[in-house]
């Protein structure tokens, strides 16, 4: 990372390391995930007015009714995905691009879909700042996935559907894993593993995400 991206004060590497320590104490076990969380400058994915809060373990607004997910949940979902070592990962909900940047450091190919064009444009700029080259972005309804690029052996969903759309399950490769928050008021983080035509579901822990909405915003 450049000196500009390292930041100073509240955005410094030391501040990031304190966040990493909190995540480790909170139950994140993967050293690889924690290393990447410590490297990726979360502050550049926020408006300047909020950048001083970048390394708090909390979700923060990014506009258009969307949020930058809590670092714990970014680390948790990434850790769950990493346990299955997928090579081709589909992310639904690029948002600010922070989760995308984290994924890009751990998996060879990332395909990320965002329905809100201004968010996607800003995410693209930030990923370019970080010289990320293994991510393809698409402006589309995330609930439909990216069928022409599938199947994927990893799918991560960063907004909550009431139920996982069948279209996404169909894009999951045999042996692949899907990590998503599911539900309305009472959401749960789920892990779904495809075994042939059977989908094995594990409910993991309660979460709170913005809902997965259909359509696109230009």
From Swiss-Prot:
Record InterPro entries: PCMT (IPR000682), SAM-dependent_MTases_sf (IPR029063)
Keywords tagged on the record: Cytoplasm, Methyltransferase, S-adenosyl-L-methionine, Transferase
An example Gene Ontology CC term for this record: cytoplasm
EC class (word): transferase
Stored Pfam families: PCMT
Keyword Oxidoreductase: no
Entry EC no(s): 2.1.1.77
UniProt keyword DNA repair, yes or no: no
Major localisation: cytoplasm
Active site: 69
Location(s) in or outside the cell: Cytoplasm
Molecular function as annotated in GO: protein-L-isoaspartate (D-aspartate) O-methyltransferase activity
Catalysed transformations (reactions): [protein]-L-isoaspartate + S-adenosyl-L-methionine = [protein]-L-isoaspartate alpha-methyl ester + S-adenosyl-L-homocysteine
Function of the molecule: Catalyzes the methyl esterification of L-isoaspartyl residues in peptides and proteins that result from spontaneous decomposition of normal L-aspartyl and L-asparaginyl residues. It plays a role in the repair and/or degradation of damaged proteins.
Family annotation (PANTHER family): PROTEIN-L-ISOASPARTATE O-METHYLTRANSFERASE, PROTEIN-L-ISOASPARTATE(D-ASPARTATE) O-METHYLTRANSFERASE
Record's protein name: Protein-L-isoaspartate O-methyltransferase 1
Native organism taxonomy: Bacteria, Pseudomonadati, Pseudomonadota, Gammaproteobacteria, Pseudomonadales
């Amino acid at each position: 990372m450049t000196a500009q991206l390292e930041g100073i004060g509240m955005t410094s590497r030391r501040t990031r390391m304190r966040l990493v320590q909190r995540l480790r104490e909170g139950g994140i076990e993967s050293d690889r995930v924690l290393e990447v969380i410590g490297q990726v400058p979360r502050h550049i994915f926020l408006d300047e007015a909020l950048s001083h809060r970048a390394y708090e373990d909390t979700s923060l607004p990014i506009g258009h009714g969307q949020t930058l997910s809590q670092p714990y949940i970014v680390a948790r979902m990434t850790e769950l995905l990493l346990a299955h070592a997928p090579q081709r990962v589909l992310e639904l909900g690029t948002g600010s691009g922070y989760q995308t940047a984290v994924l890009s450091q751990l998996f060879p190919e990332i395909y990320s879909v965002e329905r809100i064009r201004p968010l996607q444009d800003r995410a693209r700029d930030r990923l370019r700042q970080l010289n990320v080259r293994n991510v393809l972005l698409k402006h589309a309804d995330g609930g439909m996935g990216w069928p022409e690029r599938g199947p994927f052996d990893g799918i991560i969903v960063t907004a909550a559907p009431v139920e996982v759309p069948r279209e996404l399950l169909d894009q999951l490769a045999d042996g692949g894993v899907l990590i998503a928050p599911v539900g309305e008021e009472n959401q749960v983080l789920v892990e779904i593993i495809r075994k042939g035509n059977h989908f094995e579901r594990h409910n993991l822990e309660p979460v709170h995400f913005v809902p997965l909405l259909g359509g696109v915003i230009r």
